[in-house]
């Protein structure tokens, strides 16, 4: 039953998310104001990382079989027809893209907070920015280590090739050993970004709103900043809501070696779920983008009226 549901879900999820991200990229490139250059590039990279995450997730469609020892990674997607190394590397690419997206969304909050401060020290800001980005490089290093030690060795590839003599349903692409150092690092990075960033983001939101109320910002400017910071804060909290329940279940089930098919099949689905809403949150919370959408809608309505009106007169 789970496989039947997911065989429909993954294509539908791809069709729903990717066009909205492409539309957002177009609007960012075409309609971002000059004062929005830094945020423009951050939003672009965030969108690209989400496209990569969604695409690779749909290609691998993994199931982490936590009741087996060692824990096996099963691939149900099209990449099961390729070598296990390609699918295993894609599995980590998906993780990296998710971490990049989460970290850059938080970085957007931090930079917006800095933009509302009167006095800022550039050297300190650069250091904090690098610290915020550091989880990306740490996770990438740990994932590269696992690919080099677990994926590339010929004996491991030969072993997986023997196991995967029949890939009509799925392929085993690798193993998860939670007690190895790289796996521990990856687990801490992912859970850290999910747990810590929302709390700090909420604090920065509070400070940003306090800054715009105390500093000499116009009413319009205050409304724009408030709408933007509220939207980005919501983005930071979405992974916490979607990810923590299933990840907590994963850790418990991995330790107890209990099989719960729902958790195994839908783990990667729930991790990606925030990306369904992210483009619409940005399009609504960033005033120039929202106004452009409203302009298109009004233009479309006028065109519809102009097309219908002559026919109505002819009928009269």
Swiss-Prot record:
The keyword Endoplasmic reticulum belongs to this UniProt entry's keyword annotation: no
Membrane-spanning residues: 8-28, 42-62, 91-111, 128-148, 184-204, 234-254, 266-286
Assigned keywords, A-Z: Membrane, Transmembrane, Transmembrane helix
InterPro entries registered for this protein in UniProt: 7TM_GPCR_serpentine_rcpt_Srd, Nematode_rcpt-like_delta
Superkingdom assignment: Eukaryota
Subcellular location: Membrane
GO cellular component terms listed in the entry, alphabetical order: membrane
Membrane topology qualifier: Multi-pass membrane protein
S-S bonds: none
This protein's record includes keyword Flavoprotein: no
Family: Belongs to the nematode receptor-like protein srd family.
PANTHER family associated with the record: SERPENTINE RECEPTOR CLASS DELTA-45-RELATED, SERPENTINE RECEPTOR, CLASS D DELTA
Name this polypeptide is given: Serpentine receptor class delta-45
The organism of origin for this protein: Caenorhabditis elegans
